[in-house]
């Protein structure tokens, strides 16, 4: 028998906690026998004293085990359970293509996703732009979709890692969100509860990233890879660029539209293609679905070219109660804003830098994101035809097309877009799309 205050005292004094102590405290959070004040105190001591790798693994496993851990054995599936998690960015619509692409190559992708908060978009919000799309199927329906289609994208239910929800809410109001051991446990508790064989992490770097510096992004990637592998899930991470909007669009319906056009081959933004392919390659290799990088890329290109990935996306939408002909008629189903017009720079020049976070907040100001978790979303608004770093802009070549529902919102977003983009006379050096692969 342990006392919560003694566990806090031990960590406060810089000592390592045992697996049993950590599990006791996390179960206490779940069972409401540990107070908010005690959660806050432990979070702050971890923030200042960090955690060893065994402590981090124990914390993650305890949070995972605070609720249901999915088990797929009874379905006798003939492929691995694999997933991807991104630390979030702007125009990061990779999940919508990646899930169907990997499923088309023989993987099973039980993706449990989140909503957008702050400048980052949320996969669930994007999917809810599709009429009827059900992000909370019951457990048997979720399992059936995985068995029949190979991929489902759903929201976190109350039975998955419930201790994390309470722990995170306390961290959010006590300035302890940006602790690497706590971020790692929060991300992985939910992902490992999916019952995965392998996971790939997409850790963003740059002006639109969750972590403010390259070094902190790298530290987080290494922590997640170390803890996930320590917990028995084969995991790699890619550090990818978020110094500009990843897709050509940012919003909800506009990103879904781009995802469908990507899958059907109508239009594939080169940077979005590179990141999506790189993440899919990791998933195929980790899941044993390809022999090497070239083999994985060939398989993935084949399912894009032959339409299998697009077909699986359509089947997933239909299985989750969206329209059965969504891929064929997406424009007739997705909501459109009342006003769509381009924004131009006030002078001509070459785009040398972007404040990607500010561009994400421009989408929020249009109504396409949330400042608070309870805010409603306007699915129709956003940015499209985003200019890229290094592009020349003038009175004919816009910075973006803004989709708004009134003139005032359009003007406010136009001012924000102009302010977020730096112009010069000489192109900046091209940044890599994928900076680094981390395996341990």
Curated annotation (Swiss-Prot):
Pfam families: Glycos_trans_3N (PF02885), Glycos_transf_3 (PF00591), PYNP_C (PF07831). It comes from Yersinia enterocolitica serotype O:8 / biotype 1B (strain NCTC 13174 / 8081). Its EC number is 2.4.2.4. The lineage of its organism: Bacteria, Pseudomonadati, Pseudomonadota, Gammaproteobacteria, Enterobacterales. Belongs to the thymidine/pyrimidine-nucleoside phosphorylase family. Coiled coil: none annotated. It is an enzyme of class 2 (transferase). Pathway: Pyrimidine metabolism; dTMP biosynthesis via salvage pathway; dTMP from thymine: step 1/2. This is Thymidine phosphorylase. NCBIfam families: PRK05820.1, T_phosphoryl, Y_phosphoryl. One of its GO terms (biological process) is pyrimidine nucleobase metabolic process. SMART domains: PYNP_C. Keywords: Glycosyltransferase, Transferase. The enzymes which catalyze the reversible phosphorolysis of pyrimidine nucleosides are involved in the degradation of these compounds and in their utilization as carbon and energy sources, or in the rescue of pyrimidine bases for nucleotide synthesis. The keyword Membrane does not apply. PROSITE patterns: THYMID_PHOSPHORYLASE. GO terms for cellular component: cytosol. Homodimer. One of its GO terms (molecular function) is thymidine phosphorylase activity. InterPro entries: Glycosyl_Trfase_fam3, Glycosyl_Trfase_fam3_N_dom, Glycosyl_Trfase_fam3_N_dom_sf, Nuc_phospho_transferase, PYNP-like_C_sf, PYNP_C, Pyrmidine_PPas_bac/euk, Pyrmidine_PPase_CS. It catalyses: thymidine + phosphate = 2-deoxy-alpha-D-ribose 1-phosphate + thymine.
């Amino acid at each position: 028998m342990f006392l919560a205050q003694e566990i806090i005292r031990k960590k406060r004094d810089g000592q390592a906690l045992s697996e049993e102590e950590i599990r006791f405290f996390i179960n206490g959070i779940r069972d409401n026998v540990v107070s908010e004040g005690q959660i806050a105190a432990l979070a702050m001591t971890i923030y200042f004293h960090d955690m060893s790798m065994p402590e981090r693994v124990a914390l993650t496993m305890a949070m995972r085990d605070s609720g249901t851990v999915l088990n797929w054995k009874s379905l006798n599936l003939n492929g691995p359970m694999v997933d991807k998690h991104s630390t979030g960015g702007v125009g990061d619509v990779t999940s919508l293509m990646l899930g169907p692409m990997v499923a088309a190559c023989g993987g099973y992708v039980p993706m449990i996703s989140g909503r957008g908060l702050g400048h980052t978009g949320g996969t669930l919000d994007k999917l809810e732009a599709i009429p009827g799309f059900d992000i909370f199927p019951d457990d048997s329906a979720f399992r059936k979709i995985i068995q029949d289609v190979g991929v489902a994208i759903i929201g976190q239910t109350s039975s998955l890692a419930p201790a994390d929800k309470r722990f995170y809410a306390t961290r959010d109001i006590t300035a302890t969100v940006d602790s690497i051991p706590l971020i790692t446990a929060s991300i992985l508790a939910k992902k490992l509860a999916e019952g995965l064989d392998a996971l790939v992490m997409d850790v963003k770097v740059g002006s639109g990233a969750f972590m403010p510096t390259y070094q902190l992004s790298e530290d987080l990637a290494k922590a997640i890879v170390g803890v996930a592998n320590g917990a028995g899930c084969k995991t790699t991470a890619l550090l990818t660029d978020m110094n500009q909007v990843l897709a050509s669009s940012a919003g909800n319906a506009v990103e879904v539209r781009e995802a469908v056009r990507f899958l059907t081959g109508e239009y594939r933004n080169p940077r979005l293609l590179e990141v999506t392919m790189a993440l899919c390659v990791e998933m195929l290799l980790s899941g044993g679905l390809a022999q090497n990088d070239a083999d994985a890329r060939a398989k993935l290109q084949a399912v894009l070219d032959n339409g299998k990935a697009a077909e699986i996306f359509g089947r997933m939408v239909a299985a989750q109660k969206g329209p059965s002909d969504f891929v064929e008629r997406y424009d007739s189903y997705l909501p459109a804003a009342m006003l769509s017009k381009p924004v131009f720079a006030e002078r001509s020049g070459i785009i040398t830098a972007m404040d990607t976070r500010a561009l994400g907040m421009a989408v929020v100001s249009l109504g396409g994101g949330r400042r608070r978790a309870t805010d409603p979303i306007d699915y129709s608004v956003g940015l499209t035809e985003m200019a890229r770093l290094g592009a020349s802009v003038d009175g004919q070549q816009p910075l973006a097309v803004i989709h708004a529902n009134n003139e005032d919102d359009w003007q406010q977003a136009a001012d924000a877009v102009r302010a977020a983009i730096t112009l010069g006379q000489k192109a900046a050096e091209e940044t890599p799309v994928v900076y680094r692969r981390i395996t341990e």
